[in-house]
């Protein structure tokens, strides 16, 4: 046996120790998967009564969703009869419009900010901005909600919504600054730091030789950024967009504070007024009705809302995976 080599007994002990660690880690991973599966199963089982009573009409329009939720909440928890009538379209529409608008705004701002950080910002400025961006990404959503109701909503109410506009729709809905515009702006501000951090990190990994080669061929700097840097970073851009969209879909506390809290289907045909109309996204609906979960019909309905959010997140993840697959044809790792 070579000098200093471990003895066979020591090697066997080391192998057994490694196997024990692997089994322990495998058991922990399996436990996590079982817990996640149990949580998902619980949500869908508790959501089933709401879906079974309403069918596919659950996802459609029909009546005032606030009145429907109020009718459920006013039932006695021990009542033998439950009212399950529910039409979630206005909540689904509120979720879609706030999420899509916020992600579009955040994507444009994030791309420009990431390009500035990696291509134009001096090193001292970059060393200051990068920690600030990470800090903004970690700010609790309730802080953004406070900024929305204390600063953004009053400003919109006083300076952007005229009295004539308020009176023109006053018989239908009250315009007070807690609306689609405020929710979209604050939500975009919330998800932008996440996207900037991910996209900037991807742009920073683009080989410098690729950019220098493009410039050497006579391509100007902006065209090099678009054709070389952004194209190479496409997987990260897709991943950042998916992650930010998932964050926007699941945001509850902030949106419950600034969106207006009404199940009102904001109508794009109303023109500019559309942006000043209140909305209520799905996640915010759960927060606003959390105290009534002990009431059977309301509790099952909120679980149904949670199930829709879970399915939406799963579909979003699959869409992100599918969007990145064509990039592999060009040798881009996704």
Explain the meaning of each model-derived region.
Residues 256-310:
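Interhelical loop and adjacent transmembrane-helix boundary motif
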Residues 85-116, 241, 309:
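Transmembrane alpha-helix signature in integral membrane proteins
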């Amino acid at each position: 046996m070579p000098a200093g080599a471990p003895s066979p007994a020591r090697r066997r002990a080391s192998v057994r120790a490694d196997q024990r660690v692997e089994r322990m880690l495998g058991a922990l991973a399996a436990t996590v998967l079982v817990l996640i599966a149990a949580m998902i199963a619980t949500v869908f089982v508790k959501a089933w009564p709401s879906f079974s009573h309403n069918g596919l009409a659950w996802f459609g329009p029909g009546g005032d969703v606030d009145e429907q939720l109020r009718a459920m909440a006013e039932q006695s928890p021990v009542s033998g009869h439950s009212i399950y009538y529910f039409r979630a379209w206005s909540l689904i529409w509120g979720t879609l419009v706030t999420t899509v608008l916020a992600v579009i705004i955040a994507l444009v701002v994030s791309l420009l900010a990431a390009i500035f950080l990696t291509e134009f910002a001096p090193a001292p400025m970059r060393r200051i901005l990068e920690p600030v961006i990470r800090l903004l990404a970690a700010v609790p959503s309730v802080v953004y909600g406070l900024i929305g109701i204390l600063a953004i909503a009053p400003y919109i109410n006083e300076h952007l919504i005229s009295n004539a506009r308020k009176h023109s729709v006053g018989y239908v809905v009250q315009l007070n600054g807690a609306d689609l515009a405020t929710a979209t702006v604050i939500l975009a501000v919330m998800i932008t730091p996440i996207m900037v951090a991910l996209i900037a990190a991807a742009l920073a990994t683009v080989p410098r030789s690729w950019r220098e080669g493009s410039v050497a061929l006579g391509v100007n700097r902006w065209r090099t950024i678009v054709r070389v840097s952004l194209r190479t970073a496409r997987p990260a851009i897709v991943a950042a967009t998916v992650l930010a969209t998932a964050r926007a879909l699941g945001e509850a506390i902030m949106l419950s504070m600034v969106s207006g809290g009404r199940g009102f289907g904001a109508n794009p045909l109303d023109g500019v007024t559309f942006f000043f109309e209140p909305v209520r996204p799905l996640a915010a609906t759960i927060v606003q009705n959390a105290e009534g979960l002990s009431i059977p019909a309301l509790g099952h309905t909120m679980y149904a809302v949670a199930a829709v959010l879970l399915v939406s997140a799963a579909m979003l993840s699959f869409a992100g995976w599918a969007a990145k697959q064509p990039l592999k044809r060009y040798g881009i790792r996704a």
